[in-house]
Amino acid sequence: MTREGAEAIEQTSQRAAETPFARLVRHCVERILHGGGDSSSDELDFGIATMLGLLAMPGAFATIFLLDKYGSFFRFLRGEGKFDAYAASLPDEYFFIVLAMVVTGAVAIWKWDSLIPDHRDYANLAPLPISSRNIFLANLTALLLLTGVLALDVNAASSVLFPLMVCGSESSFAYLLVFLGTHLLSVVLASIFSFFVILAILGLLMAALPYRVFRTCSVYVRCAMAIFLMALLSTSFAMVRFVQNPSAASQLLMKLVSPLWFLGLCQSLRGVAGPAFASLGRFAVVGLATALILAVGAYALSYRRCFTQSAEAVANLPSTGGVAGEHFFRSLDKLFLKTPFERACFRFSLRTLSRSESHALIVGGFTGLGIVLASQTLFEAARAAPHGSTSPSALPSVDLLSVPLILGYFLLLGVRFAFDIPVLLRANWIFRFTVNPETGECVPLARKIMLTFLIPLLLIVCLPVCVWRWGWSMGVTHTAIVAVLCLFLTEILLVRFRKIPFTCAAPAFKSSALVTVVFYFLGFAIFTSGTSTAERWALEDPLRYLVVVPALAGAWLILRRYRGEMTELDTRLTFVEQPDTAVEVLDLTFRR
């Protein structure tokens, strides 16, 4: 290509990028990525480069963890002979398809409010000399572009590393290309299918329900979809074993699991699919086309109703909680909300959690993850239970004892994480002017908010189920132990807490964030497996409680002593969380 031709192409592309429609598409892309509000809303958000990097990480790490399975050196050490890459990689192929659907679906759920134009877009775009048809086409184009970019980015690392790892011992380059191409096509189409299904659900709900009803049920629908995605991911390994040994009655169930469709498509393209997988591959093509048609149709219906008629729409929920809500708060005032600070901030916090979709989604997501892991633990405990161990007189296993601890851990962790995400940060001036920063009431307030979520779990779920399963003595004892351990976890999570929930700027990303995540995983293992093992050990001989109880009391005293030795600066109320300085200087020259 000549220099003049390259310059002509560059000028043509620049002119195309400056057309009104291209600018409108760019505006729609930025609105979807950064939300519909103003840039100073201080919500949890990421830059484009950071977000794309984070989305590619799960697939990359999952591939690295498979090195010991597919590495030729490790297979040589294990004494493995002939290696069939297609058969050996079938479980992991299904896992990567599920992972692609889960990550893409999670992004669609998180950006739920930004996928379809709302009243803010109507206020900004309707007065301009732009037809509604062009606005609709620009939004649709932006959605299709982001869907493609998202599907490619989520699977970029795994689509290269996984085929190279599996086919590393193969001498044929064509074999690698076939494996890579079929894997890439399957996971990308699975990601697109997941995004379109969620978009179709969103559009159908917005088109069918009144706006207030949609806003009310939106959080519950998103939490339900998040729980479904987590359940799909957590059961991926069991599903592959089920597919490898199918029965006649399981053929219908296989057709209802959408990730199996794309696994069948992948195997069909490779030419190694049996009759069952070949039929599932046809389901993938039909399902993807159906999801695309439903998504575009539902998007058009919801666009017409929620954008062109959004001048009459009300974006906020009612400001009052009704008579029942007032009675609830008055009852809590008499029980344990003693000071005006606690009463006001408690109402503010609960109403934030119930009305803010982002905060409710955080708590619901953590709780949903706890439900999935608890259900999986319960299933494994029931399957591993020997004959005769299901009688009420038998001692419960360690897995059964850990189920309520898993639920409590993720519920408390979700509420604590939501505390750090601000809501309308510019409105915290009322707290700055009216609250004395020296009162030290932040920890008691946060503790009571977390107990408000914990107590129903203990009294409505844990106690009745344990009493029904093991009788009053064992049920009350186990519920009391769970309550004490959850209280101890609450105190640990609030050790350095010195803010009013939802009023402090979100903490910046720190280099120690990965270490914090590792500590959360270790804490989960200790809090669930460690404590349930100690409880099971004590149940075998009640005298062993003389060891368990003093150990727990000693840990409690250590925590109280650590909190008592904190300086006034560490307990003073703050509204701006200062990042840790990388380098501390003494300033011995006293220069100013």
What kind of feature is each model-predicted range?
Residues 145, 205, 428:
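Anion-coordinating catalytic cores for phosphoryl-, nucleotidyl-, and glycosidic chemistry
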Residues 125, 135, 214, 360, ...:
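Alpha-helical transmembrane segments and their helix-entry boundary regions
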Residues 132-164, 438-466:
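Selective transmembrane-helix segments that form parts of the transport pathway or gating/packing helices
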Residues 85, 112, 127-141, 145-149, ...:
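Structured, mid-chain assembly/scaffold modules that mediate subunit interfaces
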Residues 107-128, 415-432:
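Transmembrane helix boundary and interhelical loop/hinge segments in multi-pass membrane proteins
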Residues 60-63, 80-82, 99-102, 112-118, ...:
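Nucleic acid-processing catalytic cores of prokaryotic defense/repair systems
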Residues 1-101, 105, 153-415, 460-463, ...:
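Transmembrane alpha-helical segments and their membrane-interface loop/helix boundaries
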